[in-house]
Amino acid sequence: MPRGQKSKLRAREKRRQARGGLEDLIDALDILEEEEESPPSASACLKDVFQSSLDGASNNPHGLREAQSTSTSATAASHTRHPEGVNDQMEERPICTQDLEATDSFPRGPVDEKVIILVHYLLYKYQMKEPITKADMLRNVTQMSKSQFPVILSRASEHLELIFGLDLKEVEPNKHIYVLVNKLDLGCDAKLSDETGVPKTGLLMTVLGIIFTNGNCVAEEEVWKVFNTMGLYDGIEHFMFGEPRKLLTKDLVKENYLEYQQVPNSDPPRYQFLWGPRAHAETSKMKVLEFLAKVNDTAPSEFSNWYTEALQDEEERARARVAAKARVSATAGARSKVKSSKSSQLQ
């Protein structure tokens, strides 16, 4: 078979596999959407987990069915904001399990359905590493007037950011070309997606936020309590994120995003999570705090204690970068002097 034909067949098979993975995701979402007539929004679900924690609500995680509706938040279409003044009431407490009674549900309309379709479409383009244009979105996805496009794009962008950890950025405003950028400064060997192409960065940022707001070290049971409110259960396969325990204690640990260690002198043994070296390298406390602030529709500075700690971390990172550059410059200068000395001796 000619080489060109083989290349076309491989490309076609790659597209088929990508479509298959996302079609499986869409099928799973459709099933859960049928179970919940009015699923909560992407922002509302995460906001309720974090916001209720910050407000100090009583510990009372709801059952599996309600948590399942929470887990569909990546494709739910409603967009909500907290009532006025709610941020003024926030207290800085560690993120832990809290009830989700504030979760709102909304009727689904044509615009909401378009948001869901656009999220699917953008995830597909991200997996295929294909450019995203406004013209393609209008023609192939939204199929509606340009006046509705900004609202649909804004909501889809929020879901992608809060759940999948992807930022939608316009790279060529004149041509309306967009790209999806991972919130982490991923290395070349990063594997924060599975065979469906669903990025797990949003979930990782959530875990890093739990660790950060619990004094940079959190007991495993506290992470599971938050996971349960998000519809993630130990030993139960999740249609987007796989088996949570494997992801949390093996995959993310193997990738060096998390450290999983036994609590000293604990009997029976208990375990805790810390940031791994890769998390420190690819994100920062400030970026994680910005993520939490985005979830709660507020500014990072509203969380004064954590903001102060994040600022100190930024300053330390800046000093480390300056010191590293100085070392590189000094090394380069020393090598230049050695070469110059050898050259003069030869002459």
Curated annotation (Swiss-Prot):
Protein origin, superkingdom: Eukaryota
Region (Disordered): 1-20, 56-92, 328-347
Xref: Gene3D superfamilies: MAGE homology domain, winged helix WH1 motif, MAGE homology domain, winged helix WH2 motif
Domain MAGE: 111-310
A Pfam family matched in the record: MAGE
One Gene Ontology term, aspect cellular component: nucleus
GO biological process, one term: negative regulation of transcription by RNA polymerase II
Keywords for the protein's UniProt record, in alphabetical order: Tumor antigen
Biased composition (Basic and acidic residues): 81-92
Compositionally biased residues, Basic residues: 1-18
SMART domains, per database record: MAGE, MAGE_N
Biased composition regions of type Low complexity, renumbered to the chain: 67-78
Protein name as annotated: Melanoma-associated antigen B10
Phylogenetic placement of the source organism: Eukaryota, Metazoa, Chordata, Craniata, Vertebrata
Gene for this chain: MAGEB10
